[in-house]
């Protein structure tokens, strides 16, 4: 695709690329249908990685509710409208974004590919798509930012240590983040049977904690821990325990030999598990963050209209309606079902982003029609990464943009700004 085609007619340009390659006998390595994409990704991942990435909480009914919510709404296409030129761009926090799509934060991407955080940064940046760097990345935010030519935000898990929170925000600002996305729904880890039945939590292996081990405040906390007398029983020596020790040791900054001698990697993992989340986080904590950054602050995980109103009262700049892809609370409402109530409560005063359950362009268009300013996507591009690395992630995003463009035009709508609730009906 040429740069002009990507932004003015991405659907037709993407189709042309695929069909022309097909005429020479080449087929897309990245499946364009959701079921085939999921199946190909599962084949490409280890059982542990697949369980962690694809799994959700409990019976996974919230994950299903996310999908069911989209299926309950149907587009109502209009005919004989000039849609020869389409505009997918949106305005967010003073920046014009070419597409209404945000790359949502996904942690522990090294389960899929060792360089996955860097790969998705490059893929998103090459398309001008805003990406959100995860607190649970496997590279420091500064390294990820250096790979990303596009706009980026930083996702904050609010630690039990305020000084660490402040350090993360300061680093995010310095590395060029344009917004802070506070994830609210992880005060405790959800009940995830796929991981529990395997006894597998990647953080214990030292995975996904590079933001922490690269942080001066966190490293001080680790040093303070190591200076205290050891407490508790020593881990039982088994082959699995040795593999865990090797895993955390090779991922920790420094040489393997020195890390093994010092015991710092284990102390870092234990410190992370202690400070990662704050179950006591409440509305009264938000001024602390507001006082420490001039960046827009978005709250991710809002589902109830009253929480949306309270967010406005707190001076929050944006809301992300999200169920964490169903990974935290089983039996909860689907994200799209929550969207209209939140949009109504907000009344256009701040942008509302829909995250969770998005499989393709038709889902993007339905969310936009129901009032979302933009749509966050996560698992789909992770699946692309698993299949074909950076190129796989890029192609998933290209396909999503292309389908969004085509569904928009075929529904008789020329611009995202024209989309409204009249474009859909509930069945």
Predicted features by range, described:
Residues 2-94, 199, 203-208, 215-281, ...:
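An N-cap/entry alpha-helix motif that binds or orients negatively charged groups
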Residues 108, 122, 147, 160-354, ...:
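Alpha/beta enzyme core
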Residues 97-136:
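Glycine-rich active-site/cofactor-binding loop and its immediate structural neighborhood
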Residues 402-427:
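Charged C-terminal helix
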Residues 46, 347, 388-389, 420:
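Glycine-centered helix-coil hinge/cap
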Residues 74, 89-91, 100-104, 130-132, ...:
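Short, conserved beta-strand segments within well-ordered enzyme catalytic domains
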Residues 66, 197, 335-342, 385-405:
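C-terminal helical cap(s) of enzyme catalytic domains, especially alpha/beta-barrels
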Residues 126-147, 151-165:
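A gly/proline- and charged-residue-enriched helix-loop-helix capping module
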